[in-house]
Structure formats: structure tokens, C-alpha cells
Amino acid sequence: LKMGLDVDKVYRYAVFSSRKKNYLGVLEEGAVDVKGLTGKKRNTPESLKKAFREMVQGLGQVHSPRDFDEARRRIRDIVQTCYRRLERHEYSLEDLAFGIELTKDLDEYKKTTPQHVKAAKQLREEGAEIKAGQIIYFVKVKGPAGVRPLKQANVNEIDVEKYKDQLKSTFEQVLDALGIEFHEIMGYARLDAFY
């Protein structure tokens, strides 16, 4: 069996997550190719997407081992800053909002009730017309519902712990590949709060 193979892309270097099909590759000209990582997904809150883009930009500027060490330090700083801002309630509701599309009418969700559906039902209770195809914006809050539509939310209700978990899941894939432990960074962030 003879097959012709072509080179599709040449990476200066790549960072692989432990999960399949999740990686970040830096092309020769510095562009960064991100595949399957949480920080790139549409429904990730804007605050985390922005921090993820900062991280990607820093990795795109690596040309040497010294640059790589500097990028690791910057990434650690980016994650610590996000963590601190979450703890201090410095993000706006818009920065924390998830936006997920309703793929079917509300009444068609029978077995499970995803978070965006819970938020959509709260909007409907307030008199809003909700249809399949609509993007539902919500934030994670303390309390039994666990979510609140963005329009009804108050910054004091935000469940900071849930957002810390989201921060971890967004960055941990890349941090692991870079040899950085998430809990280590958070330990530094907590110690820094004393100074």
C-alpha cells in the first residue's frame, strides 16, 4: 500500500495536554494553534478567555529556553491574578457570564436540566419569551439553583468557588504540560494576600 504524505504544519514547539486531541502548537512564525483546550471554547466566561489569550500570546513569543522560563513565570502570574480578582470580586458580571445556546425548546428538556436551561426557566418565570436557538447568558451563584440569568444577577451572589474550579479546568491542561501545579500557584496567591 503506497500513500503520499504531506507536511501539514511545522511547529516550533508544542505543548500537549494529558487528554487526547488537546494541544497547543506554536508555528514557526509565532502563530499559535490551539486544539480542544477549554480556554478556547465559546461558552467560557470572557474573563477566562482573555487570560487564556494572554497565556497563548506569551507562549507564541518563545524562541529559546530562557524565553520559555519567562513565559512560564508570566503564565503563573496570569493565573494568580485571575485567582486574586475572583477572591476580591473584581470581575463584572459580564466578565463572569457563560453564554450557551438552547438547542431545543425548554419543555423538551426532560431527564436533566443543564445550567443554561435552569437560567432560561428563571427568565421565563419573569415573563421573557424563550425559544430554541437563543443564547442564554448566566452566572454561577450560591444557593439551590446554582445559576442566575445575567439580567437578574447580583455580583454579591457569585459563587467564587465555582469560578475557581472553572479557572482550574481552563488552565490546568496547559499548566500540567508546562510542569506547573495549579495548587502550587494558588498557594502562592493565598500567601501573597497577606503582604
Predicted regions mapped to residue ranges:
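DNA-dependent DNA polymerase catalytic subunits
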Residues: L1-Y195
